[in-house]
Amino acid sequence: MTEIKTQVREIADVQRVRLRSQYANELFIDQSEDESLTIEATPRVLERIETTVDGGLLSIDLAGGIGDRIRDALTTSLTRPHVVIRLSLRQLRGLDIAALAYIRVRRFETDTLDLLFNGPGEIEFDHLQADTLSVTNSGPGMIRLAGQVSQQDVSLRGPGEFAARDMLSKQTRISVNGIGNATIWAEEQLDVTISGIGGVLYMGSPVVRSKISPMGSLARLGDR
């Protein structure tokens, strides 16, 4: 059996998180006054994971030379190392993910949040409370949100999905440039632009302004 070890890394004053990795990653984030970071992986994998904090940005990257990079590129679903990251933060204003990752964020309150996702996997918030939310999903992954925000700006640039039927938003602007799909709950204003063959489903009775390509679709699901 492969040995798994848990390593504690020192962090302080983190507000944004950036993850770059060829591994299979699980990242669990919760809100706490006591900041902490633990990583679970094999000893060899732990040696390659670099964590730095600079200007409030926590970067999680892979170290290694050209040989390591080649081996990373040749990994498959059967050989790809697995990493579990547990993170407790006082504040979260940015999440930038370019990796195969499953990310679970429990209840979190913040003034503003920027989500950037480019990779397979899923980002899920159990309950998000924010004034403003900006989302860019450029890959095939799923972003699933519940909670409440005042304003949100969503951009789907690939085949990914945005599932937010359980997150109330007063003002929503969404653009779909590929084959992505979104489900949202809008209360006051909804601006939709679809230039690909994707679709948007919405709940609620907002004032709707739309610009839809012939292959795109916009439909109302009804009230909550």
Model-predicted regions and their roles:
Residues 1-224:
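Intrinsically disordered, low-complexity terminal regions
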